[in-house]
Swiss-Prot record:
Broad class of the protein's primary localization: cytoplasm
Enzyme Commission identifier(s): 2.7.4.22
Alphabetic keyword roster: ATP-binding, Cytoplasm, Kinase, Nucleotide-binding, Pyrimidine biosynthesis, Transferase
Compartmental location: Cytoplasm
HAMAP family to which the protein is assigned, alphabetical: PyrH_B (MF_01220_B)
Gene that specifies this protein: pyrH
The protein's name in its UniProt record: Uridylate kinase
Record-stated family: Belongs to the UMP kinase family.
Record flagged with keyword Transferase: yes
UniProt organism field: Chlamydia felis (strain Fe/C-56) (Chlamydophila felis)
Recorded GO MF terms: ATP binding; UMP kinase activity
Length: 240
């Protein structure tokens, strides 16, 4: 990528804050995230974060178990992202890193209501922007919410940090040993091949706004590495 990166948006899963032992929000993992956000900010890069809520509740997965409807399940998932966002915001503040916690749902006692204008201003002031509650509507995932925020905030790059794969493959590498990883792939090919690394709506939004997406392993690599090292993960862009 030849364009200088000045503003990025990270999409991380709620799972990245939890441990296999059952800690919903693990102190070590939270501290790591804060340190990495500081490192990116120290590179004079404006940083936004969209975080999932799967460490607390997985709306779709638990919809049938809890006998609740899809809308309620998705709304519960949105609230889970707010819980994670509050934890990250407090951890950043404890480390003297200025931030703005926003929500697409109105809950003024907990977070500022998300608006593109106020959020862009916070980024320009050097604050880490934390965007919670996804797109703010049921039936839309946090991937789509992240793509929406990236478009509204005119991010130079959307980075999806995953816990299970280190990029985009032609098929699931966890199931197929002969899966082939792409170093670079076009938006259109991701869509035409039905590669499920992100929602089709998220890919389409970024394609329309010409925002490249880098998919990388948050287990193997840091946030800073994902921005600057073009050999990490997979870049989804206009031309492969």
């Amino acid at each position: 990528m030849s364009k200088r990166i000045t503003r990025v948006l990270f999409k991380i899963s709620g799972e990245s804050l939890s441990t296999d032992s059952g800690n919903r929000i693990d102190e070590v993992r939270l501290s790591r995230l804060v340190a990495e956000l500081r490192a990116v900010r120290n590179c004079d890069i404006e940083t936004a974060l969209v975080i999932g809520g799967g460490n607390i509740i997985r709306g779709l997965a638990q919809q049938k178990e809890l006998q609740i409807n899809r809308v309620s399940a998705d709304q519960m998932g949105m609230l889970a992202t707010l819980i994670n966002g509050m934890a990250v915001a407090d951890a950043l503040k404890a480390d003297d890193i200025p931030c703005l916690l926003t929500s697409t749902l109105s809950c003024p006692q907990l977070a500022d209501l998300y608006t593109p204008q106020k959020s862009a201003e916070a980024l320009s002031q050097g604050k880490v922007l934390i965007c919670t509650t996804g797109a703010g509507s049921p039936y839309l995932t946090t991937d789509t919410g992240a793509a929406l925020r990236a478009c509204e905030l005119k991010a130079d790059l959307l980075l999806k940090a995953t816990m299970h794969v280190d990029g985009v493959y032609d098929k699931d590498p966890r199931e197929f040993s002969d899966a082939v990883k792409y170093n670079r792939i076009s938006y259109k090919e991701v869509l035409s091949r039905g590669l499920g690394i992100m929602d089709a709506s998220a890919i389409s939004l970024c394609m329309d706004s010409h925002i490249p997406i880098r998919v990388f392993s948050f287990v193997k690599h840091s946030l800073e590495q994902a921005i600057f090292d073009e050999h990490i993960g997979t870049l989804i862009c206009e031309d492969a």
